[in-house]
A protein has these predicted regions:
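Compositionally biased terminal segments of proteins
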Residues: 1-176
Length: 176
């Protein structure tokens, strides 16, 4: 079992990973790691991330870093689970530059939709924190979701009605 990740461990991981970046790279943090950097959590079990462009050097470095620091690292993005919401790239928030590595929060609206779809207690707490800090506006999330709804066929595991209900509940409109 690997130890949970606090802010100092996350920063140390990112700084070491940046040493392997040989070209300008955008690293998108999502899930608990994003919440941790926002100050909305004190720890996370995993460092969930994705990067562009993909790099063999960074992938190799991540494997050795996760063993050396005894952390869980997952290459994952909310768009693996829900459709990318329109304009998602424009809503990714720059966090820091470490050498050639630009660290960003993945679009908080797509993150929130992914967490609503999963529906775990911790996910719902994360969504409430994003709303409470005014990072995500529930009405805007519903609008963006409506625009992306036609892409749900690409995600057979999603129950469109349940996801719509979860979004409506967040807005305060219970259609159940």
């Amino acid at each position: 079992m690997r130890a949970s990740v606090d802010l100092s461990r996350l920063r140390a991981f990112l700084e070491e990973l940046a040493r392997a970046a040989r070209e300008p790279t955008r690293l998108y943090l999502t899930g608990g790691a994003s919440q941790l950097l926002r100050g909305l959590r004190e720890s996370t079990l995993d460092i969930d991330l994705t990067f562009e462009p993909e790099s063999d050097e960074l992938l190799r470095s991540m494997v050795s870093l996760k063993e050396w620091q005894s952390v869980n690292v997952e290459i994952v993005s909310p768009v693996h689970f829900v459709p990318a919401l329109p304009g998602w790239r424009d809503r990714c928030e720059f966090v820091m530059q470490i050498g050639k590595l630009a660290v960003l929060h993945f679009d908080p609206y797509t993150q929130a939709l992914s967490k609503l779809e999963r529906g775990h207690v911790r996910d719902m707490q994360d969504v409430q924190a994003l709303v409470g800090e005014r990072i995500v506006d529930p009405v805007r999330l519903r609008t963006l979701f409506a625009e992306a709804r036609s892409e749900l066929f690409r995600y057979p595991a999603i129950d469109p009605k349940s996801l719509s209900t979860a979004v409506d509940r967040l807005v305060g409109v219970d259609k159940a």
